[in-house]
Every structure is written in C-alpha cells, then in structure tokens.
C-alpha cells in the first residue's frame, strides 16, 4: 500500500503515530516512503522527516473527527509560546474522557475467576510485602485492589492464567514501590538479582527479590511456550534494568526529552511483560516472524502506548505529590515544549484517540491475511490488547491508587485537584 491511503488532513497525525511505531524490535526495519510535510504535531514531537510502517495504514473513517481534534488542539502552536510550566501552577485540571475514547473496544466484563485467583495471589505476594512494607503501606496496597485490574484486563483467562497475571501485577507494584524509595545504586543491584534469578536455575542469594522471582518463574513462566518464556524473561530483565536508570534520573532531577521518554517509558511501564502473559492466557506462542512483522509492531506499539499514556494521565497527580513527576509524559511535554498542564493533558487525549485508530487498523490489515498465525491468532491477541486498554482505564477509577476516596467523583467530573507535595504520602516501611 502507498502513503496516498492517508487523507491529507491526517498526515499530521500519522507523523505522531510514527513515533509510537518504532523501537519495539532492536533490529533495523526497511525504510518506508517519506510522507508529505510536517505539521504542528510533528513539530511538537520533533519527529524527523521519515516514515515507519504505520504510514502504510489508513486511519478508519470513524476516527477522522477524533484525529482532526488532536491536530486542532495545538493549531498555531509555537514552541515556548505557552505559559512556562515552571511558573504556572493550576490547582485543577481536566482529564480527557478516556472511557469514551476506548468504548470502541468491546466491554467483556470481569473475569469470573476473580475471587478465587485474588485470594490465592494475595496470599502469595504477602510473603514478600510483609518483608518490604510496613503495616500502613500493606493496608494501602491491599486497598488499591491491584488484582481487580487483571479481572478487567484479562476477562477471558482461566484460573491458571488469571492467577499468573495477578502475581505479575503484584510483583510490579511491589517492585515499583521498593525502587521508588531507594537509590539508583540499590535499584541497579536489585535488577542484577532479578536477572540472575530468572536466568540461572541454581542462583539463590536468599533475598526476598530473588525468592519472589524464582517462585513466579517456576509457577508460571516455566509452563509457558518457549517463545513466550524467552520473550517474558528478556522483557522483564530489560524492565528492571531500565527502572534502575529511572531511579538514577530521579536522583539527578533529570527530565528526558519527548522521543527519549517514549523509548524509555515503553520499558519502565512493563507492559511488554503483561502482553507476554496475554499470549500465555490465550494458550498462544506466536512465532518470532509475527513479532517482527511491521504491521504487527504498529498494532502492538499502539496497544502498549495506550496503556502507559493512560497511566501517565491518571497517575500524574499522585506522582507530582510524591516528587516523582519527572518520569511522567505530562511533565515531559510541559518541560520540553513550555506548555501548561492543561495543554499537555489535552494533547495526550487526542494522541490516545489516534493510537486507538492505529491499533484497530493494524488488526484489520492482519485479519485479511491468509496465514492463520495472523488472521486467527494475532486477531485474538489484538482483541485482548483492546481488553487491556479499556480495562486499565476502568480499573483506574475504581481503585484508590490514583485518586483516593475521590475516585468516583473524578470519574464523573474528570476534574482533578492537585495535591500538595508530600501531603499524605506513605513511606514504604510505615
């Protein structure tokens, strides 16, 4: 297909999508034809004049209005022309209506295995939380109902698969809290322990991190297909390595530019590992040529980016109150481009609409192929990515993780009142 499939009015958003379509695989991709021109959105993201596989994808007609809205939100934008984020401190901002945007993905409800899997997963993770966390932090994490997110995001999984996803989610939250409070050196050391625990059968240094990861691998990853197991271990080891780098950036109070943050966030979000378990839960083990396919990559990246962009939006208030907002795309856009908070949030809402179109279009193209690995198996996977995207946002308004007792009010009004820094924040050992 040629780039002429893109309507001229959508060329701008295609360039934004381009940023989301690169770097999944560390292998170089064949160059694609160069699209015509740059736009206000291309300028915002400093996107070079080159194209990726998504340039081949036509955005579906129902999304024309949505993607044009993303462009119109920043029409007339000139870098530095808005209020500098460092000198402007609004107390309230409005979230984009992500539930409306993601309503194009079917609502498959909650997983019927939720209650039994939750009980067993919580008993398993509590072996490690009681070592790391104080009683108040344990109570807070229990109230966050992390396991409920898996019931939303994996509605099709059997008990075995759902328990695996809950165990992983509990690992990720515990590891995140642990590394958030430690130094960069401590995070790097923990990453080394994780890598050896996953890759060396006889390694055991006696730490809670080592025991936790070896137990998870034996319970779940050793039972997955060889491709899924290999990708999960590689992706998890890369995740903990980059989390160590995140801790070092936090110590230096360093904020990345937008392109580097995109690449960085794809790893620190750990969404790749969650998507590995999508294959596991669906009893799939896709061949590597599927994972290397450019159209598959564009759909995969769209789903992955939608998960962590949405997370950055809903978690911004919590993170800025803890002094961790530097590792959030809202701050990255504000700092890099000198725009105010609401402008950055509005842009991200439009960006999520464009990525939604990208995911659906990738699925449409792959479904038309004769190879059943695409037309049957990948379609199931892309549908499950939609469950993840929609379920992640639904859970974000049910948990107290991001908005505390105000979660239902925020869901209804979309208005978020900024917390004062460090007010109500819990220490890990508290």
Curated annotation (Swiss-Prot):
Keyword set includes Lyase: yes
Catalytic activity field: (2E,6E)-farnesyl diphosphate = viridiflorene + diphosphate
E.C. no: 4.2.3.-, 4.2.3.88
UniProt enzyme class: lyase
Glycosylation sites: 113
Keywords attached to this entry: Glycoprotein, Lyase, Magnesium, Metal-binding, Signal
Names of required cofactors: Mg(2+)
Signal peptide from the UniProt entry: 1-25
Binding site for Mg(2+) 2: 176
Residue numbers covered by motif DDXXD motif: 176-180
Binding site residues for Mg(2+) 1: 176
GO biological process: isoprenoid biosynthetic process
UniProt GO MF annotations: metal ion binding; terpene synthase activity
Residues given in the record as Mg(2+) 3 binding sites: 311, 315, 319
The keyword DNA-binding belongs to this UniProt entry's keyword annotation: no
Sites where the protein binds (2E,6E)-farnesyl diphosphate: 401-402
InterPro entries cross-referenced by the UniProt entry: Isoprenoid_synthase_dom_sf, Terpene_cyclase-like_2
Pfam family, one: Terpene_syn_C_2
Family: Belongs to the terpene synthase family.
Reported function: Terpene cyclase that catalyzes the cyclization of farnesyl diphosphate (FPP) to viridiflorene and viridiflorol.
Entry text on domains: The DDXXD motif is important for the catalytic activity, presumably through binding to Mg(2+).
PANTHER family documented for this protein: BETA-PINACENE SYNTHASE-RELATED (PTHR35201:SF4), TERPENE SYNTHASE (PTHR35201)
Protein name per UniProt: Sesquiterpene synthase Agr5
Species of origin: Cyclocybe aegerita
């Amino acid at each position: 297909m040629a780039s002429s499939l893109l309507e001229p009015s959508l060329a701008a958003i295609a360039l934004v999508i381009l940023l989301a379509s690169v770097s999944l695989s560390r292998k170089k991709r064949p160059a694609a034809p160069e699209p015509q021109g740059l736009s206000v959105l291309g300028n915002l993201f400093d996107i070079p004049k080159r194209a990726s596989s998504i340039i081949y994808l036509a955005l579906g007609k129902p999304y024309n209005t949505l993607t044009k809205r993303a462009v119109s939100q920043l029409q007339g934008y000139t870098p530095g022309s808005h209020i500098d984020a460092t000198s402007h401190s609004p107390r309230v901002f409005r979230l984009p209506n992500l539930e409306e945007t993601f309503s194009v993905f079917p609502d498959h409800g909650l997983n019927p295995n939720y209650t039994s899997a939750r009980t067993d997963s919580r008993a398993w993770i509590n072996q490690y939380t009681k070592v790391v966390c104080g009683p108040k932090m344990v109570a807070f994490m229990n109230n966050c109902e992390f396991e409920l997110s898996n019931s939303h995001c994996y509605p099709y999984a059997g008990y075995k698969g759902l328990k695996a996803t809950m165990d992983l989610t509990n690992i990720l939250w515990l590891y995140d809290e642990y590394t958030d409070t430690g130094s960069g050196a401590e995070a790097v050391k923990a990453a080394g322990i994780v890598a050896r625990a996953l890759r060396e059968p006889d390694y055991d240094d006696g730490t809670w991190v080592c025991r936790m990861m070896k137990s998870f691998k034996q319970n779940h990853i050793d039972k997955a297909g060889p491709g899924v197991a290999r990708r999960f271990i590689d992706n998890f080891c890369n995740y903990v390595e980059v989390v160590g780098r995140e801790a070092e950036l936090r110590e230096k109070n360093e904020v990345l530019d937008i392109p580097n943050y995109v690449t960085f966030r794809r790893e620190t979000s750990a969404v790749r590992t969650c998507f590995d378990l999508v294959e596991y839960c669906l009893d799939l083990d896709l061949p590597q040529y599927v994972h290397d396919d450019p159209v598959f990559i564009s759909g995969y990246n769209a789903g992955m980016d939608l998960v962590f962009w949405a997370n950055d939006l809903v978690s911004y208030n919590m993170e800025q109150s803890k002094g961790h907002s530097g590792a959030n795309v809202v701050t990255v856009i504000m700092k890099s481009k000198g725009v105010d908070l609401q402008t950055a949030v509005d842009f991200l809402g439009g960006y999520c609409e464009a990525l939604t179109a990208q995911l659906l279009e990738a699925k449409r193209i792959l479904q038309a192929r004769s190879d059943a690995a695409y037309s049957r198996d990948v379609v199931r996977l892309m549908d499950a990515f939609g469950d993840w995207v929609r379920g992640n946002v639904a859970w974000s308004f049910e948990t107290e993780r991001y908005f505390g007792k105000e979660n239902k009010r925020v869901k209804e009004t979309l208005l978020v009142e900024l917390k004062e820094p460090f007010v109500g924040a819990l220490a890990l050992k508290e």
